[in-house]
Design a protein with these regions (language model features):
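Juxtamembrane segments flanking the first transmembrane helix
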Residues: 1-84, 90-93, 151
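Glycine-rich acetyl-CoA-binding "A-motif" of GNAT/NAT acetyltransferases
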Residues: 136
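Short coil/loop residues immediately preceding or within conserved phosphate-binding loops
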Residues: 73, 120-125
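Acidic surface patches and DE-rich sequence motifs
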Residues: 80, 117-118, 132
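Extracytoplasmic/periplasmic sensor domains and loops in membrane signaling proteins
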Residues: 59-62, 84-121
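Helix-start (N-cap) segments at beta->loop->alpha junctions
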Residues: 123, 131-133, 141-161
Length: 163
């Protein structure tokens, strides 16, 4: 009888832990996506007027964007509408994102995948258009490894277990 109760408790604990971990991960993913989206929106609105669709290496925003990238733990890229990389805070040397089509992901403000083959693993990616005189001139792209998001969710979940 006691063995049955112990087995039931262990199974219940396992099920609850698994479900809570998944819910916590989804919540963390959504929370970080919202934060990244707001950051991308801020970058696009703050520096959109200075952005002319050309070379942004001389733009005063480059050092600031690198600082934001380090602070948020996200890679920040400015892409032209055709996918040409205008600026990349990771200094990857990438010229363009092949097959870039922002219309492909209109259902959500974030995506979790390899972002048009750019990454070797899944990344949480948020993009926001840079507009100037009512025309889309490019896109602000923020990307963060899903492994980092999972780590943040696990740290939060572990903290909840301790308390």
């Amino acid at each position: 009888m006691i063995t049955t109760y112990l087995i039931g408790i262990i199974i219940s604990f396992g099920i609850i832990s698994t479900l809570c971990s998944k819910f916590n991960y989804r919540s963390e993913l959504s929370s970080q996506a919202d934060y990244m989206y707001k950051t991308a929106m801020s970058i696009a609105s703050e520096y959109g007027n200075a952005y002319s669709g050309g070379d942004v290496d001389d733009a005063p925003s480059l050092p600031f964007l690198k600082a934001v990238s380090r602070y948020t733990g996200c890679n920040i890229m400015l892409l032209a509408t055709d996918g040409a990389v205008l600026m990349d805070t990771s200094d990857s040397g990438l010229d363009s994102v092949k097959g870039f089509d922002p219309a492909k992901y209109k259902k959500s403000n974030y995506i979790v995948n390899d972002f048009f083959g750019l990454y070797d693993s899944d990344y949480l990616t948020v993009y926001y258009p840079i507009t100037y005189l009512y025309n889309t001139r490019g896109y602000v792209i923020l990307s963060k490894s899903v492994k980092d998001v999972r780590s943040d969710a696990d740290n939060s979940f572990n903290f909840n277990y301790i308390t």
